[in-house]
Structures are given as structure tokens and as C-alpha cells.
């Protein structure tokens, strides 16, 4: 059995592709890695021109819909072409629900459905660790790991 793994030339993605290739070899699946520049990689994903592809997503706001909306049938970034009317209906209902607990429950059901359907196969999650001295003020931990320096200030640095 042979698969082509589409990825960009990003060093992290190439390393993860090599690890996945080794894992597939252990179960007797031959995998070729096809690395191209990011613009070409995005284009082939939009055209669904791949067997398996590495797609990355970074949450730009703190809500589960940031990831779950990607799997809606009509989503622009639904590169795998996942389509499940039950999933879409759950997400539509969640979008219209103002009760946060109910909304969360609906999105959890949608997530479980997508996992059961293998709509995605998450390989890894990026982690950022911020080490900030106590005299730095204005630093707010957030999902994007983003703090503008114009909002930062410092108190007197303690003497050693």
C-alpha cells in the first residue's frame, strides 16, 4: 500500500512527516513525502489534491468553534472535504444557542462525531511557554501567546 504525504517545506512539518513515515513503515504502509512551498501546499489542499496532508491551524480567538467550524461541509478550509449533515446541524444549532452550557454540549457532540468519523487525525499540538519576570507588568497569558510591547511596562528590577 502506498500513500503520498503532502506537506510544506516548513522544518517542523517536515520533521513530523518523517516521524509519521516511520510509523507507517512499521505497519507496512509505504509513504512518500511531498514537500512544496507553503503557497503551493495550500493550493493543493484547497483543490483536495493529496492522499494525506499536513494542515495547521492556530486559534485566533478562545472558542471551540474556531476549530470545529473548519469541518463544516461548506467551510473554505475544510481541506479534507469532510461532510456530515448531523455534524453541520449540531454546529448550526450551537451557533444559534445562547445558553453556554448547552452550546458547549452541542459542540462536544459535534466533536465526538467528527472524531468517530476520523474527519481529522491530530498528530501534535504546538505549545508555547512564556517565562516572564515578576517586574514585567501588563503581560497577559492568552491562547495566541501574543502580547504587544506597547502595553508592557516594568517596575524597578530587584537588585541582586
Regions found by a protein language model. Name each.
Residues 9-23, 41-160:
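Detector for C-terminal structural segments
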Residues 1-9, 31-34, 51:
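Short, well-ordered beta-strand elements
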Residues 25-39:
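Short, well-structured beta-strand/strand-turn elements
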Amino acid at each position: 500500500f502506498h500513500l503520498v504525504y503532502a506537506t510544506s517545506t516548513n522544518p517542523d512539518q517536515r520533521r513530523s512527516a518523517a516521524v509519521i513515515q516511520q510509523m507507517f513503515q512499521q505497519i507496512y504502509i509505504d509513504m512518500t513525502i511531498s514537500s512544496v512551498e507553503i503557497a503551493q501546499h495550500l493550493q493543493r489542499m484547497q483543490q483536495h489534491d493529496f492522499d494525506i496532508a499536513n494542515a495547521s491551524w492556530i486559534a485566533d480567538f478562545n472558542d471551540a468553534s474556531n476549530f470545529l467550524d473548519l469541518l463544516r461541509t461548506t467551510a473554505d478550509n475544510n481541506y479534507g472535504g469532510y461532510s456530515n449533515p448531523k455534524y453541520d446541524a449540531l454546529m448550526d444549532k450551537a451557533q444559534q444557542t445562547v445558553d453556554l452550557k448547552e452550546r458547549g454540549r452541542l459542540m462536544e457532540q459535534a466533536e465526538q462525531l467528527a472524531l468517530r468519523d476520523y474527519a481529522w487525525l491530530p498528530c501534535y499540538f504546538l505549545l508555547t511557554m512564556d517565562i516572564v519576570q515578576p517586574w514585567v507588568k501588563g503581560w497577559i497569558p492568552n491562547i495566541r501567546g501574543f502580547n504587544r510591547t506597547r502595553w508592557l511596562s516594568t517596575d524597578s528590577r530587584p537588585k541582586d
